[in-house]
């Protein structure tokens, strides 16, 4: 068996790769590792999910696994991933479990686990959970009164909405937003949050039926949102994914405002308000060179991490910084949460618009996106490519030819025998030519 945990929990085709049996084993193992009995009474676990059909089956299995290990379950129902992380801390739970495959198609599902305080797990803790789940370490199995009980949390959504309200320093009166909820976990709370802050809200794709999550909508399919923003004459559009841990935006003309541009707007606003710790932003190596240039021109330092919001979080924690994120729209505000929060990002973005009186297109123009070409190359051995002197020489030659006007990044896939070749340059044709040449070199190894 390969490693259970990927870059964002356990994920796979529901009922084939991610079975009820596996969900029970993982939940029981997580409870064994993260909720050891001690003083203060029985430990608790928050459980939430997105609305995809398999979530009900997996929720039942997760609840069974947790209670079989002696943990009481606080079931919060359908809520975004960041809400589950927040409630794990708010309710003083020993762990939290979110059942979701995020932006993946409906047939997939996943299990994300949070430690006490709503923090994502590090590799060492994941390895310990995996050891218990696969039977190489002993799981806890109490009997009688030691078995956990199940409780619902009827005010879970209200608690999360109140939390979001406290994170927004100003009102959004006068702004009109179209929000694409991806028929996902934020279909109720996202429109409610934006309305509570004073915005006029047009909600689309906010009628989940268990089967339509992420189907031609949400942050991976922006076409419908772009048309709706123009049709309604809205100030902007916001797109969430199935579990609402990310947010992308669309300006009044229907043009994309991606995660890099969103971070630019937020970083400049937080700097002006004295909220940007050490005038530093944390982003991944996949962020566009245009973000680097914009931050440098603004006097803001940029710390780069590996791809994945868990690595952004590590960078934020290690430096004590206050803003980080990814091009894909995961944005983290450590003062208000422990993971990417799409609804909070949308609120803060509109807050900057309300504060300045400027449209989002004007605010986002502080960053110019450089042309980027990405080529996926199938390889026999990713490690051989990484160690190849021929590939290294080709990368160095490409970097010399670009100088300060571009960059090159080779990144092995975390799940497939692929190497991703990315080239950015001020000229699209130059980027294409270099990317194709490098892809050919990688393929020849």
Curated annotation (Swiss-Prot):
Indicate whether GTP-binding appears among the record's keywords: no
Q: How is it modified after translation?
A: Activated by phosphorylation.
Q: A GO BP term, please?
A: carbohydrate metabolic process
Give EC number(s), comma-separated: 5.4.2.10
Q: Does the keyword Metal-binding apply?
A: yes
> Per UniProt, what is one GO molecular function of this protein?
magnesium ion binding
The record places the active site at 102 (phosphoserine intermediate)
Q: Which domain of life is it from?
A: Bacteria
> In the record's cofactor note, how is the cofactor described as bound?
Binds 1 Mg(2+) ion per subunit.
Q: Which cofactor does it need?
A: Mg(2+)
Tell me the keywords, alphabetical order: Isomerase, Magnesium, Metal-binding, Phosphoprotein
Q: Which reaction does it catalyse?
A: alpha-D-glucosamine 1-phosphate = D-glucosamine 6-phosphate
The Phosphoserine modification is found at: 102
Query: Which residues are Mg(2+)-binding?
Result: 102, 241, 243, 245
General function of this protein: Catalyzes the conversion of glucosamine-6-phosphate to glucosamine-1-phosphate.
Q: What is this protein called?
A: Phosphoglucosamine mutase
Which organism is this protein's natural source?
Rhodococcus opacus (strain B4)
Q: What is the lineage of its organism?
A: Bacteria, Bacillati, Actinomycetota, Actinomycetes, Mycobacteriales
């Amino acid at each position: 068996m390969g490693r259970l945990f990927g870059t964002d929990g356990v994920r796979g085709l529901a009922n084939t790769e991610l079975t009820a049996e596996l969900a029970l084993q993982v939940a029981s193992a997580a409870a064994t590792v993260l909720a050891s009995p001690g003083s203060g009474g029985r430990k608790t676990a928050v459980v939430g999910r997105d609305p995809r059909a398999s979530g009900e089956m997996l929720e039942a299995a997760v609840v069974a696994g947790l209670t079989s290990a002696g943990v009481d379950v606080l079931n919060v129902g359908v809520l975004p991933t960041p809400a589950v992380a927040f409630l794990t801390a708010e309710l003083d739970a020993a762990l939290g479990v979110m059942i979701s495959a995020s932006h993946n198609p409906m047939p997939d599902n996943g299990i994300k686990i949070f430690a006490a305080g709503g923090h994502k797990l590090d590799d060492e803790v994941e390895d310990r959970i995996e050891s218990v789940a696969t039977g190489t370490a002993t799981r806890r199995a109490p009997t009688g009164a030691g078995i956990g009980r199940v409780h619902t949390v009827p005010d879970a959504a209200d608690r999360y909405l109140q939390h979001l309200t406290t994170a927004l320093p100003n009102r959004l009166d006068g702004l009109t937003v179209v929000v694409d909820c991806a028929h996902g976990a934020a279909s109720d709370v996202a429109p409610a949050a934006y309305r509570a802050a004073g915005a006029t809200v047009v909600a689309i794709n906010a009628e989940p039926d268990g089967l339509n999550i992420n189907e031609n909508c949400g942050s991976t399919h922006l076409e419908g949102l772009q048309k709706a923003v123009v049709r309604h004459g809205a100030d902007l559009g916001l797109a969430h994914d199935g579990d609402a841990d990310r947010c992308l935006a669309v300006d009044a003309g229907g043009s994309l405002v991606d995660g890099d541009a969103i971070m630019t707007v937020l970083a400049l606003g937080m700097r002006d308000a004295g909220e940007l710790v050490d005038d530093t932003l944390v982003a991944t190596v996949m962020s566009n060179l245009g973000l680097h240039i914009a931050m440098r021109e603004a006097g803001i330092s940029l710390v780069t991490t590996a791809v994945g919001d868990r690595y952004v979080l590590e960078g934020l924690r290690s430096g004590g910084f206050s803003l980080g994120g990814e091009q894909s729209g995961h944005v983290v505000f450590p003062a208000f949460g422990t993971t990417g929060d799409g609804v909070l990002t949308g609120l803060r973005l509109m807050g900057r618009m309300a504060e300045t009186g400027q449209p989002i297109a004007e605010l986002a123009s502080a960053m110019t996106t450089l042309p980027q070409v990405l080529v996926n190359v199938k390889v026999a051995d990713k490690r051989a490519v990484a160690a190849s002197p021929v590939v290294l020489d080709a990368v160095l030659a490409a970097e010399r030819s670009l100088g300060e006007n571009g960059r090159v990044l080779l990144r092995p896939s975390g799940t497939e025998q692929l190497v991703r070749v990315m080239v950015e340059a001020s000229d699209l044709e130059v980027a294409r030519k270099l990317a194709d040449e490098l892809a050919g070199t990688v393929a020849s190894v």
